[in-house]
Amino acid sequence: ILDQYTQQGGNSMYLIDPVHVQKDSLYALSGTTVSYGNALELDDLFFKFGFRLRQELVKDLYSAPIVLAQGQQNTSQYLPYPWPYNPLAAPNQDHPIGSAVGSVHFQFASPIDTLKNKVKKTVLIQSSSLSKIEGIPSLINLSSATEPIKPSLFTDSKQTLGVLLEGRFNSLYTNRIHPFEWKSKEIQPARMAIFSDGNLLENQIDKGQPLELGYDKWTNNFYSNKQFLKNTIHYLIEDNRFLSLRAKEIKIALLDTAKTESELLYWRYFGLFAPLLILLILGLIFNGYRLKSYRQ
């Protein structure tokens, strides 16, 4: 269904976890979990489309913190700690989707590889240059957040976490025998966005109610997940008016600093005495008019 939908020009957005991390176990009393591959049986289809989701985890020094309780019972304190498994990724500012959008909060994301074919590919979002790839399966321990981070280990450069694909996608079933005759064999152009984190559009819950997308209630921080995904959807449905309006830049004319400093004394005295001079002239005109009226 996905293959034929794309062949007929259907636009789509995928948010997929190539690696499964059981967060319920991680945040339980044990504070540990094991990451392992998430078998979705979509690898061949995505490979044909022109990309591959790698079953690895991206760790980033530039990341969102997590809040952990420190101390015992009544004396415990909730403190933020850096958590490299939560990359704060930077959108592509040169594309309408990422223009003027801040950092986007990912959780246990994976790298994406692009493959050579006729489909146009644009990287939408990446981790920072201080990234590290972690293989699976791996043991993830919550207590590691309190340990010192070694920046020297984060040497894997930027990792792609989101890609936009545009063009005519070849079918996975090309040159295979069809069970029935397809009406149109002409492939229609389509757009596709892929992100390697299914939690990208996950809202946090507070008192049974969903919070705004991108808001972290534990740190009181706002991230740009909502705006980034809205831009992606508007681009996929070809709502260019919304994107062009958001991407519009208003240039503010700035004063010439050197000229301002050189003429500072002049304008200071001008601002001080010019109003007084204007009042004096107006007073003389008014008095002259009154004297002329009395003489008549």
Task: Identify the meaning behind each predicted range.
Residues 55, 174, 238-245, 279-282, ...:
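Intrinsically disordered or highly flexible coil/loop and linker segments, enriched in small
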Residues 230, 234-260:
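Juxtamembrane amphipathic/hinge helix adjacent to a transmembrane helix
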